[in-house]
Regions:
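Conserved GTPase G-domain signal focused on the G5
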Residues: 10, 39-42
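Residue-level "edge-of-site" marker
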Residues: 4, 34, 60
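A short acidic, often aromatic-flanked loop/helix-cap motif at beta-alpha or helix-coil junctions
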Residues: 35-40, 62
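Gly/Thr-rich phosphate-binding loop signature of adenosyl cofactor/nucleotide-binding cores
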Residues: 49, 53-106
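Beta-strand-loop-alpha "switch" segments that mediate conformational coupling across diverse proteins
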Residues: 26-36
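Feature captures the catalytic cores and cofactor-binding loops of soluble hydro-lyases/lyases
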Residues: 1-23, 28, 78-80, 92-138
Length: 138
């Protein structure tokens, strides 16, 4: 018997509990720990789900997994501490200061690396904002 998505800190206890309930005591029991990356959607999958398109960035990064989602409908001062490793950050398209702060945080090396950014809303990005990240590396 195999128990999947098990709490990594409780593997032995889970195996023992399941072993006690098995009908045939000779059947081995294993527990496989939860792995967030196995259930995380890819950036490409999220892009398809929201009918989005790549505006900037390396298309090779679209295969990365999004481990969490940060909804950034707040000022950059409040968004930055909420960034987590490999998160997708959803930013209102008219909050360009939050977009720029997120891009800078991602490039800085002092904040968690984000997996992607989704801009939400009908507002086009101003051309200077589109040009600014051209000097950043992916």
């Amino acid at each position: 018997m195999i128990v999947n998505r098990a709490d990594p800190e409780q593997l032995d206890g889970i195996e023992e509990a399941v072993a006690a309930l098995r009908p045939q005591k000779t059947t081995p029991v294993w527990a496989i720990p939860e792995d967030r990356t196995l259930v995380a959607p890819s950036i490409d999958g999220i892009l398809a789900a929201v009918d989005g398109r790549l505006i900037k960035g390396d298309p090779d990064r679209l295969g990365r997994e999004a481990l969490t989602i940060v909804v950034a409908g707040m000022s950059m001062v409040n968004v930055l501490p909420r960034l987590t490793e490999e998160s997708v950050v959803v930013i209102p398209a008219d909050r360009t200061e939050v977009l720029l702060a997120t891009l800078l945080a991602d490039a800085s090396g002092t904040f968690p690396r984000v997996a992607g950014i989704i801009l939400n809303g009908p507002f086009p990005l101003p051309e200077p904002i589109v040009q600014l990240p051209d000097g950043f590396t992916s």
